[in-house]
Amino acid sequence: MRTHYADKVDSSLIDQTITLCGWVHRRRDHGGLIFIDLRDREGLVQVVCNPTESTVFKVAESLRNEYVIKVTGKVHKRPEGTVNPHIPSGEVEIAASDITLLNKSKPLPFNIDEYQEVSEEVRLKFRYLDLRRPEVAQRLKMRSYIIREIRRFLDERGFLDIETPMLTKSTPEGARDYLVPSRTHPGQFFALPQSPQIFKEILMVAGFDRYYQIVRCFRDEDLRADRQPEFTQLDLEMSFVEEKDIQQLMETMIRHLFSTFLNVPLPDPFPRITYDEAIKTYGTDRPDLRNPLTLVDVTDLMKSVEFKVFKEPANNPHGRIAVLRLPKGAELSRKAIDDYTQFVGIYGAKGLAYIKVENIDNGTGGLHSPILKFLPENVIAEILKRTQAQSGDILFFGADKAKIVNESLGALRDRLCADLNLYEGQWKPVWVVDFPMFDREDVGDWQALHHPFTALQETDPEKVIANPGDVLSRAYDMVLNGSEIGGGSIRINDIGMQYAVFKVLGISKEMAEAQFGHLLMALQFGSPPLGGIAFGLDRLVAIMTGASSIRDVIAFPKTQTAQCPLTNAPAQVETLQLETLGLKVSKHRK
C-alpha cells in the first residue's frame, strides 16, 4: 500500500509522487489549507491539503486524531521559514492528491500528540495507544536493534543460539516457581524456568562449547519496585574458559553496544573491585562509581569510648561503625538532616549521628554536633584525619550491625548524590569479584550467595565443609551506574565438590538426587571446565534508553502488583478446566 516510510522522505524525493500510510498525529487548519502530520512507525511527515483538490480537502476536513489514512502526493520543498530541523522529513512536505480513510478511531482516553501525565494503570490498559507515542515506540525499536546487534556479535564469535525448555522441573532456585499442572500426569506439575542454568550446563557437557539464548524467565517473587514476573535474559555459557575469558568477551560486547548505539566510549578494561571492597567502601555490591562519596570505617576507634551507641557495635563481631563525608554538607539545615535520618530508618538504622566541620583549624571548637561530648578529642582528631574532612563538610555516622550500616549508609550515599547532583561522568562500569560463596544472618542456615552451582576458589571439599564462611566463589557481576546488568560465574564441574556445596546448604544427597539428579549424572560423564553469564536485557535496554523503569522497555509489562490491565490477567478459569486438571481452588488465605 505504501512506497515509503516517513524517515525516508527527504529532499532527495522532491517532485516525486509517493504513497504513505499511517495515523493522523495532528491536524491543523491554516489560512484555507489543512495540514496533517502523518505518523508511522518511523516518524512524521507533513501533508498539505489544498482546497483546489476538492475531494482530498473534503476527506481532510473529516479527519480526527488517530484516524488511519493512506496519502498519495508529490514531495515539495517547504516554504522558507517553515523547515522543521528536528525530523528527517523536516525540509519537505507532501501535497496530497489522494487521501483514503482506512479506519476511524474512537475519542482517545489520553492525548498521543502531546505530552500528558497519564497514570500507569491507564497507559497499560490502553497499551496499544501508549505504544503509538513516538518516545515509547522508540524505546522498543531500540530494544529490537540492540538484540539484533547482540545476536550478530555472538554469532560472529562462534556461539550457537539454542532454545531450552519452557516447561521444566521445579527446583529450589530462590524465588517461587510458576507452576503448570499436567493434564496427562494428574497431580504432577511443570515449572516455568527461573533461568536456563541447568540446561545450559548440560549443553556444555554435551560438547556445544558456546551457547547463547535471548530467553524469557519467570519468578513468582514478592512485589518489589521495578521487577517483573516474566523478564528477558541474554543467557550464555562457554566451555574451556576461566573468568578472564568471559569477562573480556562481555566487556567487548558492552563496549560495542554503547559505541554503536550511544556513541559512548567505555573504559578498556573495566575496573575490578572485590565484593569486600565494594561493601566496605560503598555499602553495596552494586556501586555507582559516578558517585564520589565513600564510606570510611572507624570501628576500631570506637572500641574503648564510653558512648554506648558506638561502643556496643564496635565490640560486636557482627557490628560496624562507618562515616560518610559530604563535602560542603555543613550547610544542610536541621530539617534536611531530620529528613535523611528518617530515610535511613527505612533500612533499619536507629538514628543518624553527625558532626558538622565548620572550621577544621579550630580543633573541636570548630565542630558542631550533639555527640562531641561523648567522644575523646584524640578519637575525634583521628576521625577527621581518616575521613580527610575539610571546613564546611558534614560527617554522617552509621553504628549498628554491619548489614544495617552498609545498607543505610549505602542508600544515603546514593540519595545525597542524587539530591545534590554530585555525579562525576556519565557511564561507570565495574566488575565486582571475589564474592563469598555462602551467606547467612547472625544465626541460621547457610545459603548460596549466587546459586549452588557456582565454582569455588577453594578446591578441597573438606575445607569447604569445615569453614564455609571463609570460602570465596568464582562469581562476577557487571555493574553499571549502580545497577547490576550481568552476573555469572565459573561452574562446578566436579561431582565431589558439588555434593560438598549441597552439604553446606543442608541439602542431603537424597534430596540433591531428587532435585538435580539430571545435572549430577551429567557431571559424571566428562564435564569440561565451564562458565557463563546472564544479562538482564530489560535492565540493560532501560539504562541505554534512559527509561525510568524496565516497564518502559517491555511491550506488554505487568504492573507492580503482577497484573496485566490490558488483558485483566491473572483471571479465574472455568470449573471444567480445573476439574480436567484435577485441581480445586481453596478459599484464598490472606
Swiss-Prot record:
It catalyses: tRNA(Asx) + L-aspartate + ATP = L-aspartyl-tRNA(Asx) + AMP + diphosphate. Pfam families: GAD, tRNA-synt_2, tRNA_anti-codon. Its EC number is 6.1.1.23. One of its GO terms (cellular component) is cytoplasm. One of its GO terms (molecular function) is ATP binding. Belongs to the class-II aminoacyl-tRNA synthetase family. Type 1 subfamily. GO terms for biological process: aspartyl-tRNA aminoacylation. Aspartyl-tRNA synthetase with relaxed tRNA specificity since it is able to aspartylate not only its cognate tRNA(Asp) but also tRNA(Asn). Reaction proceeds in two steps: L-aspartate is first activated by ATP to form Asp-AMP and then transferred to the acceptor end of tRNA(Asp/Asn). This is Aspartate--tRNA(Asp/Asn) ligase. InterPro entries: Aa-tRNA-synt_II (IPR004364), aa-tRNA-synth_II (IPR006195), aa-tRNA-synth_II/BPL/LPL (IPR045864), Asp-tRNA-ligase_1 (IPR004524), Asp-tRNA-ligase_1_N (IPR047089), Asp/Asn-tRNA-synth_IIb (IPR002312), AspRS_core (IPR047090), GAD-like_sf (IPR004115). Residues 197-200 are annotated as: Aspartate. The keyword RNA-binding does not apply. Keywords: Aminoacyl-tRNA synthetase, ATP-binding, Cytoplasm, Ligase, Nucleotide-binding, Protein biosynthesis. Its main location: cytoplasm. It comes from the Bacteria. L-aspartate binds at E173, R219, H450, R491.
